[in-house]
């Protein structure tokens, strides 16, 4: 199961690498793109931190043992479903890339 995730991640990184190689940017624009990338990263990290803090505050305010059990059960079911669909997606992607033999 871990090999599938590693393979899917490798394929995504490979596609992104080809996209980066294909986009030839003049030297002058690289500084502007770097600052834009930094701004986007900082913005996403700030959104993530605020969302995480809000979720933690909400969890602390509504902490009940029955609710905690329901959340844990929902998390385990959803991760099982997601891992199933990721496996299906990976298999489909590999068969698409490999082609019919």
Curated annotation (Swiss-Prot):
The keyword Lipid metabolism is assigned to this record: yes
Endpoints of the signal sequence: 1-22
GO cellular component annotations of the record: chylomicron; high-density lipoprotein particle; low-density lipoprotein particle; very-low-density lipoprotein particle
GO biological process, one term: lipid catabolic process
Region (Lipoprotein lipase cofactor) location: 78-101
Domain of life: Eukaryota
Compartments, record wording: Secreted
Classification via PANTHER family: APOLIPOPROTEIN C-II
Protein function: Component of chylomicrons, very low-density lipoproteins (VLDL), low-density lipoproteins (LDL), and high-density lipoproteins (HDL) in plasma. Plays an important role in lipoprotein metabolism as an activator of lipoprotein lipase. Both proapolipoprotein C-II and apolipoprotein C-II can activate lipoprotein lipase.
Protein name: Apolipoprotein C-II
The species this protein was found in: Tapirus terrestris (Lowland tapir)
């Amino acid at each position: 199961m871990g090999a599938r995730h590693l393979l899917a991640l490798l394929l995504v990184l490979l596609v992104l690498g080809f996209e980066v190689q294909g986009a030839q940017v003049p030297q002058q624009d690289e500084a502007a793109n770097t600052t834009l990338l930094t701004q986007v990263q900082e913005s996403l990290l700030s959104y993530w931190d605020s969302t995480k803090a809000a979720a933690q505050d909400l969890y602390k305010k509504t902490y009940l043992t029955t609710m905690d059990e329901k959340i844990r059960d929902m998390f385990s079911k959803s991760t099982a479903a997601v891992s199933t669909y990721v496996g299906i997606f990976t298999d489909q992607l590999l068969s698409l890339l490999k082609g019919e033999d």
